[in-house]
Amino acid sequence: MEKERADILVVRQGLADSREKAKRFIMAGQIYTEKALRVDKPGEKLPVTTQLTLKGEDVPYVSRGGFKLVKAMESFDIDFTEKKVLDIGSSTGGFTDVALQNGASMSYALDVGTNQLDWKLRSDDRVVVMEQTNFRYSKPEDFVAGQPDIATIDVSFISLDLILPPLRPILKSDGQVAALVKPQFEAGKDKVGKKGIVRDKKVHRDVIEHTMQTAIGLGYDVSGLTYSPITGGTGNIEFLMLLTNTEGEPGQIDSAIDIDAVIEEAHSVFH
């Protein structure tokens, strides 16, 4: 079984935003495995599948995945106040929870699966549960509580190439999209390494550029780019992209976006 340093796993799982902070948590005796065993050394090698917890941490959302949207919200200045949100790939509802806690008036929790949404959200009148729904076939009339102002996307085993086209007529004009770009599901099979992990910076760049070109070709503007503060389940670096649903075609890419700088920073944090 593949193993990795404990401090690196702490960062990958979003418990710390730097290796130095991860080391401090470990040395302070605050990091534990799922078997309630304390991790004592930053350099200790643990199976990459080990789920770690930070003692004393209070996660304010129904899942740690919510921290991905918090990063997007803060990096891209997304304002959820009184907005209608479409959460594509809602799973347990981390993104929906973040949106509602930050002022959203309602959220469509849409997922192809079933019985995943946390009960707190399932029983919330502001949440429209749309389970067993393949977004590829969604239409504007499916969203009976009103047209979404903001969409969030966190999907697996499917490319954004198949999600962005049907979203365009569903989302309000000038609506924002916070999309998680997952190289392991966007790159060709020959570009994905062992255990489904993409480590090559060039592949990361190719995936980001492809997603940007797809977006502007559909009429979205690419307005922002950063990396996710939490890696994918197998340790994959993922990226957050902000799109704007403009009326012009093709869209434009913000000249301030520096793809290489974002990739370099992500690799310095997670590898």
Go through each PLM region and give its residues:
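S4-like RNA-binding module at protein N-termini
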Residues: 4, 20-78
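Short, glycine-/aromatic-enriched active-site segment of Class I SAM-dependent methyltransferases
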Residues: 183-199
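Glycine-rich helix-loop-beta junction characteristic of Rossmann-like nucleotide cofactor-binding loops
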Residues: 15, 74-81, 144-145
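Flexible, glycine-/basic-rich loop-and-beta segments that form/coincide
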Residues: 237-271
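Conserved SAM-binding loop of SAM-dependent methyltransferases across substrates and taxa
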Residues: 92-104
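S-adenosyl-L-methionine
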Residues: 108-162
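A short glycine-rich, Lys/Arg-flanked "PGG" loop and its adjoining helix->strand segment in the class I
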Residues: 161-178
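Conserved class I S-adenosyl-L-methionine
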Residues: 80-91
